[in-house]
Amino acid sequence: MNGQNIRIRLKAFDHRILDTSTKEIVSTAKRTGAQVRGPIPLPTKIEKFTVNRSPHVDKKSREQFEIRTHKRVLDIVDPTPQTVDALMKLDLAAGVDVEIKL
């Protein structure tokens, strides 16, 4: 697999779970002999929702909720077949979304 890179994008609502997952991926890749670039933190996406507190009166009384989506990018340079097998068998936390591009 010479000259090929694996790009892994991770997304999660909780940054602590995201950081532990990136540490697991980095340690697994380094253990199998691959070179890792990252983790690179991407900008956090913040979605805000504003709703009325009461159903029909007091328009000025509102409440805001937000969802923060934290993101990280990892590049694995020149992965070995053992690296790919180890990454496929890796079990990450339930709240982490993983996108892998070859």
Swiss-Prot record:
GO terms for biological process: translation. Transmembrane segments: none annotated. It comes from the Bacteria. The keyword Methyltransferase does not apply. One of its GO terms (molecular function) is tRNA binding. Keywords: Ribonucleoprotein, Ribosomal protein. This is Small ribosomal subunit protein uS10. It comes from Beijerinckia indica subsp. indica (strain ATCC 9039 / DSM 1715 / NCIMB 8712). The gene is rpsJ.
